[in-house]
Structures are given as C-alpha cells and as structure tokens.
Amino acid sequence: MGRIKKKGTAGQAKNFITRTQAVRKLQISLPDFRKLCIWKGIYPREPRNKKKASKSSTHSTTFYYTKDIQWLLHEKIVDAFREQKALEKKISKALGRGDAHDAARLERNASRPEKTGKTKYNLDHIIRERYPTFIDALRDLDDCLSMLFLFANLPSTSTVPAKMIARCEKLCLEFEHYLIVSNSLRKSFLSIKGIYYQATIQGQDILWLVPYRFNQRVTGDVDFRIMGTFVEFYQTLLGFVNFRLYTSVGLVYPPKFDKARDDQDAGLGAFSLEGNGIGAIEQPKQITNGDASKPDPKLQAEIDKLMLQLNAPEKEAEETSKTSPDGEEEEQATETIDKFEPAAPGGDILMQPSYSATDPSTLFSKFTFFLSRETPRQSLEFILRAFGCKRIGWDAVLGEGAFTHNESDPSITHQVVDRPPMQVQPEEEEEIKEDNQTAQRLRPGARIPGRIYIQPQWIWDCINDEELKRPDLYAPGAQLPPHLSPFVKKVRGQYDPSAPLQDQEREDEELEMDSGSEDEADVSDDETAVKKQDPLTAMDVDETAEGMDVAGSDDESDEAPEKADESFGGFSEAEESEDEGETAALRRQRELEAELSGVALQEKEVDPRVKAKTDAKKKAAKKAKEEDEELERSKMMMSRKKRKILEKMVYSNKKKDAEAEALRAKRRKIEKSGKAAPRE
C-alpha cells in the first residue's frame, strides 16, 4: 500500500501561501514586504478553494503563489531590509535601557527615506528585470509620468518630504526638455482633472495627466506610504528613460541645473542643455605633432573627380525641380501617397497619410508670445517651446526665465489673455502715455495696436489641428468654439462633432427632416388661410345660419360630434380610403365641368424639388426594404448560435445609430436656431 499523504503537502495548500507565512519566511516587516511586492510586480492570488489552500483553521484572506515568495528569497534588497530591521531592534533596545547617546548614534546609521528621500538600496537591477527592452519601459511610462507630475505639484508634508517633491519636479522638467528638443509632443487637452499630453517616442504613444497648479489640500484618507513606494520605483525608471533619450539625441545627461534660478521659479529655464557630439556631424580631428601634413595632390584630384561624378545626379534633380512649376510638384507628391480604404463597407475609418503644408515643430516659430499673469505659465511655456517658439515673455510675478518682462515690447506679436475685456478710460490715457518709455506693465484693458490678443484655448486648438486657427474666434470675451478631445478615434457611423453635419447624415434622414419641416409649413399656411378668410363669404355663412333653425338651434349638438371624434381614434384605414374617394370624386367633377365648358383641364404644376425629394424618399425606402429582406434571407441560412450573435450585433448597431441620430438632430436644431436668430 502507498503511504498516506500528509495534509498541506500537495495541491492548493502547496501552491499557495498566506501573507503572514510569507512575511515570516522572508524575515522582513509587513511594510517592507508590501514594497518588495510592488517593485517586483507580485500581487495576491485568489485560490479556487480557500479552505483547501489555508493550512490553519482561521480564515485567511490574502494568498500568494509559493513560487513567487520563493523567488523573493534571492532578492538583494531583502538583505538591506533585514539589516534595517535589525538596526531598528537595536535602537529600541537602546531606548529601553535609557541610553540616548547610543540610540542617536544608531539612528544616524538608519535609513529614513520618508524624511531624507534617500535610500541605502538600489532599484536598478529591478528595472532591468521588469523591462528587458527600452520599448517595454516606454509602454509603461504613462502611469509613471502621471504619478511623478502629481507629486511634483504636491505640498511637502511629513509623509511627502520636500526632497522627494524636488526630485520628481527635476525628472519631469528633464523629460519636458527632451520633448522640446526632439519635437515629440503631439496633442494636448484641457479637462476637469487636469491637462492631458500625448507624445510619440520611437513609435510609442505616451499619454499622461498633469494637474493644474492650484494650492492642494492633502487629506488624511490617502495612504501616501503606498504611493511613495510607487514614486520611488518610478523615479528610478524615469531616470533610466531620460538617460537613454538624452543620449539618443546627442545630449549630456544629466543637464546642468541652476539652483538659484530654480528658487526663482524659472522652471525649464533652470536647465542648460549640452551636446556631447553624439548625432552631430563634425569634421574628424587629426592629431599631429604641430605640423599639418598636406594631402597628396594626385590623390586629392582623383577624390574630387569621384565626388563630382557622385553629385552630378543630385544637381540634375535640383535643376529639374527648379524648372518645374509648383503645381506639378504638388500633384506628383500627392499621387505618391497611398490611400487606405476599409475592406468592408462597415469597417473602421483608417488614418490617411497626407502632406502638411506647415511643419508642426515650427508652428509658432515666427511669433513672440507674452503670457499675462492670469494664464497657466508652465503649461503654455512647455507647449509653445515644443512647437517651435523661441521667444516667450511673461510678467515678472510669474518667475524668471522669460524672453522679456516688458509687456509693451514692440517685438511681441501675440498676447495670451484669460480675463474679461475691460473698457479703457480715456482720462487716464494721457498720464500713461507720458511715462510710456519706463512703464513695463500696462493698465488693465489697455491694448497695443498691431498685437493679436487671444485666449489660451487658441494654442491648444492650434496644436491639436496642426494649423493656425483664426484668432478672432478666440479674442478676449468671445464665445469660444467647443474644445474637443483629440484622442477620440473616429468610427464609422458614430457622431463626429468636428465633421460637417451634411457628411454624417443619411439620405433618408435628411429627407425625413425636410418632409417634417414642409408639413409644419403647410399646417401654418392653412391656419393663416383660415384667419385671412374673405369677410363677405363669412357674412353669407352667418346669414344662412340664422335663417336655418336646425343648424343654429343647439350648440350642444355641434359640440357632441367633436368630442366623439376626439375620444375615438379608430377606423384610420377607412378614413384614408374615404379621403382618397373624395379626391377622386373631386377630380371627376372637375373633368366633367371642363368637358361641358369646352376648356382643357389644367393640371396642377408640381414643384421639381418636391418631386425629386419624393422620388429620393421612395428610392431610399425601397433600398432599406431590400436590405432588410436580404438580411432575413441570410439569417435563414445561419445556425441558431450565429443568428443570436447577429441579432445582438444588429441591436447594438441600431442603438448606436439612434444615439448618433439624436445628437445630429440636436445639432441640426441648434444650427437652425443660430441661423434664424440674426434674421429676427
């Protein structure tokens, strides 16, 4: 007979381990165990049967894989945690003995990252383990940037030391400098949560959130210890990424940092970038003893001859490009672009490549901006520099690093204002004109001729659309256009607020709206015709009514049929047939009258627009009916499972179409009301 297996040596009891057992096995504290699991990417598991997985009688809630805990036993940081734990025990024993001098000596050797922001251990090897390639690190950079930008804007507290905040801010500014140099920033969006940014680095789209620079109130219900563990890991990760990015574009990392300028809130201006020659084209330097050796004249002549032969095709291409007109160049360029069309009629719309007339990296290169005091200086400066602007000025209150602090500088072309327009008082103009040479700040509401005044949204809309928008739409006090998210992907059939309404409407939808408006117009015309009835005929009717006793005797007899008609709504088909019979009888009577009088019957003139609309409506209805019949025939050939799936798809598509149609109807109503308002 085989031996009886002991309980807890096989199955789920062997594969899973509780958190208490894991902490006891690693011989570290619970906070250190949490840190280690976060850094190594180990998270709790849920066994199928908790009773079988638990070796004790008590109900355990948190389980881990036994292999994961076994893997943590070989981690280098565990030794540092054990040393710290032993040091904490020595400090507590010294305090218990009353030896304050020995406790202070041991405290100086202890690691306090929550106070100093420095640790005795290194996370470099963990970064290399979790991200074997640089692309893997870029893919996981979204949460890293969002967390570090959040901590860079927090106030310093006991749980969030000032050194940690300064380290986060420094890493974020270094990353922004790379985006400015490499022109990698693509889009940005203003939301309630903060400002979203999207950059493309080595083909990877990175999206992160930056909070607005308001005074933050730190509450006690947030566990900053866990967040601080993530920040400690993300600081090391972003340091690796920044080093790799800087070296890829030929810059020295870390860049020079001016602490004095940073104390004056210079921001990006506190860093000075230096190139180390990587990626730069330089002439090779020859090391000699002081006398430069002259090249062989024969060898030099042969080299020059070969260079002329190599450069001949390039010169011919330049000459042909100069002789050809610009229009032909554009046609040739556009013909070389491939157009990607969806394989199926209901497929998603693919992004089409196109030649842009303006380079996004030089969108603001020709302008000089001045930022008013009420505008978000840090975000505007970053976006403007990332899209080619070199000259940005702001008020001295906003900090150092500006191109100019003089608001009346004549070189300023655009001024960003985020305040309501104020009326200029003419009495104070003379006093300010006298001291115009020394004044650096204009009074509120004053404007300089020749300068464009815009609201901050103009900059965001320009970079998202990769073109300069009309500045008059974003003037101070103007009703701003809707600020739409640039991260939404276009899907066929979905409502697109940026596209014209005519391009999104279905043919039958537009015809239905037109027919509805025509019916309303006909009803209004009938009402006006009744109101404008001839008074003579009205008098005749009244006189005849007075002469007849049956018609004018009882008002109740007249009201009774009306009430009956209102209450009863049946026999609709019978009423329609009666109406058709009345129209046929009237037409027959007109034909007889025309035949007796010997005059040809005059047909009513039909409006060609109405006829075209009715024909198109019939055609659309016929097409929809054919599509429904084709769908029903195809469903008959399907199995029950596939038929159910198809019905779910059709239902969801109809629901989406109904939502899009409701949004289009709302937009159509708004546009019509906007067009009709000026006429009144």
UniProtKB/Swiss-Prot annotation:
PROSITE patterns, per database record: BRCT (PS50172)
Location of the BRCT domain: 359-476
GO biological process per UniProt: maturation of 5.8S rRNA from tricistronic rRNA transcript (SSU-rRNA, 5.8S rRNA, LSU-rRNA); maturation of LSU-rRNA from tricistronic rRNA transcript (SSU-rRNA, 5.8S rRNA, LSU-rRNA)
Entry's localization field: Nucleus, Nucleolus; Nucleus, Nucleoplasm
One Pfam family named in its UniProt record: Pescadillo_N
Coiled coil, from the record: 611-673
UniProt keyword annotation of Nucleus present: yes
Cellular component GO terms held in the UniProt record: nucleoplasm; PeBoW complex; preribosome, large subunit precursor
InterPro entries the UniProt entry points to: BRCT_dom, BRCT_dom_sf, PES
Biased composition (Basic and acidic residues): 602-626, 654-664, 671-680
Keywords assigned: Coiled coil, Nucleus, Ribosome biogenesis, rRNA processing
Region entry Disordered, spans: 312-351, 494-642, 654-680
SUPFAM superfamilies: BRCT domain
Compositionally biased spans, kind Acidic residues: 505-527, 540-559, 573-582
GO MF terms held by the record: ribonucleoprotein complex binding; RNA binding
Role, per record: Component of the NOP7 complex, which is required for maturation of the 25S and 5.8S ribosomal RNAs and formation of the 60S ribosome.
Quaternary structure (record): Component of the NOP7 complex, composed of erb1, nop7 and ytm1. The complex is held together by erb1, which interacts with nop7 via its N-terminal domain and with ytm1 via a high-affinity interaction between the seven-bladed beta-propeller domains of the 2 proteins. The NOP7 complex associates with the 66S pre-ribosome.
Family: Belongs to the pescadillo family.
The protein, known as: Pescadillo homolog
Organism: Sclerotinia sclerotiorum (strain ATCC 18683 / 1980 / Ss-1) (White mold)
